[in-house]
Amino acid sequence: MPFSGELVHGAWLHWLRCAAPDVATWLHDGNRRRFFTCSSLQFPVSQQRALEAERENVHLPLDPQQVYVVRITLLLGELFPLFYAALMRFNASGTESGNAPCMQIGRQLFRLEEVVLNNDDPSGWTGFTSLSSLVEKTKRLRLSSVQPLTLEFASLTTFNRNNMRSKSYGPHYARLPLPQYVFPGLLRRWEDIAPPELAHVVQRELIEQYIQDDGVIVTDYDLRTHRLKFTTHQQQGFIGTCKYHLRDSDEGMHSALSLRQQLLLLAQLAFYCGVGYKTSMGMGRTRPLEML
């Protein structure tokens, strides 16, 4: 199928379960938020063709001579050595048996060519950092009175609005990246993964009030609706870019960062955790386009 996010999600957990079953169980079980994201299988075709195939649910042929990419992010530092150890064990078992490490996505078997995690890959979608490094980097930012921020939503993004206070009309999927949808979700993810010494850096009440007071506004966008097919249902959403202005209000009370710096910190976090619904199944792949 042209969109394989849920299949990649399952394949990744199955691969990890074979190499490190305790880690896979910890990641999958319970009601905790996912501490990883997975992309759909990315084909070596133009973005336009890939999006058209998703929208029309047109299957793209696989060529054994081509290289296909899966992007996986790990949101806890403790997961990296576990992933590395699992990869080495899998590599050793593959060498002994004469088979290269592989992952089965649906009915297709893929051989692992390489793992890329450096910060300067031409794709612009790889990298590594720590939360403390992100905080220190953000501290050094010098902001204008109206600070621009552009986010690219590269895969289908939507927001599951089933937690609204009013249940009169039932849940729905929001298809616009309004500030009140984007930043509170990133704030919650920060609270999920930040250690105690960094949890206070992002101030929930101040950010929520700042957004409510229209401190963050949408000033430009290049968005379009999009749809894709999961195995059991069709999902609606959007893709594209959205430019925000963060207007001057830098009262970051009792925090290492000003209020607007906190929002820029969350924007950088979006590169790793994604935005919105089903980020562990290929949706919500996001990055800031400014050099933050």
Language-model features: where?
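RNA-interacting cores
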Residues: 1-292
